Amino acid sequence: KAGYRHIDTAQVYRNEEGVGFALTKALEDQGLSREDVFITTKVFPGNEARGQSPMTYSDTLNSIEPSLEKLQLDYVDLYLIHAPFCKNERVEQWRALVEIKRLGKAKSIGVSNYNQIHIEEIKSAGLPLPEANQIELHPWCQKTELVSYLNQNDISIIAFSSLVPLSTWRSKEGEKSSKSEQMKADGEDPSSIFKVLSNKYRVSEA
């Protein structure tokens, strides 16, 4: 109703079931089809630094099923590896996503929080490169070298926390920007600073 068509969630957010319920109801109430929305979710790879076992190829391959069940979908539009935490399993985790796409359970596949080194691992393994990389990106965190690398390799960039310093989670004392009012100039104006930056750096928002 408000015009939102891209829903971004993740297994670790623990809200896929709620998203699935709301999505099913919204599509029915608004007379929309599945193709009218774009659904992204993410598999958490494990984090050995926090005592979590890394996801194996098999674990990762099977990880899509509970997400689809909770989301009440046959496929997601984009499936991401949430972070590059598991050095020894990263390539196999990516190999599993390639298979998930081949099986038709994800239209596109990608990664999140990856840098050049992590993507070069995939390239060295001879596997298809990610179609997208979701990274923190905003005027205070520009990552110019990574953005250039992703563009050179035709990897779409999806920005998260793109409203910093306007977002509330970065509103501690000393973190607010003196340019906040200037940066609120968005909306339909094609000269909006947000639109200009998005077009300049070929970045979309999560």
Give the label of every model feature segment:
Residues S33-E48, L78-L80, P84:
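A short, structured active-site edge motif that brings together acidic residues
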Residues D59-L80, E99-L103, S124, I155:
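CE4/NodB-like, metal-dependent polysaccharide N-deacetylase domain
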Residues K1, S53-Q72, R90-E92, I117-E121, ...:
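Short, acidic/polar
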Residues K25-E35, L71-L73, I100-K105, A125-L129:
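Short helix-capping segments at alpha-helix termini
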Residues R5, D74-D77, K107, E131:
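Short acidic/polar active-site loop segments enriched in Thr and Asp
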Residues K1-V37, D74, L163-S167:
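N-terminal binding-site loop/beta-alpha segment at the start of enzyme catalytic domains
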Residues A83-A206:
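Beta/alpha (TIM)-barrel catalytic core signal, keyed to glycine-rich beta->alpha loops juxtaposed to Asp/Glu
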Residues A10-G18, G46-Y57, F85-E89, L137-Q142, ...:
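Acidic-and-aromatic substrate-binding clefts and catalytic sites of carbohydrate-active enzymes
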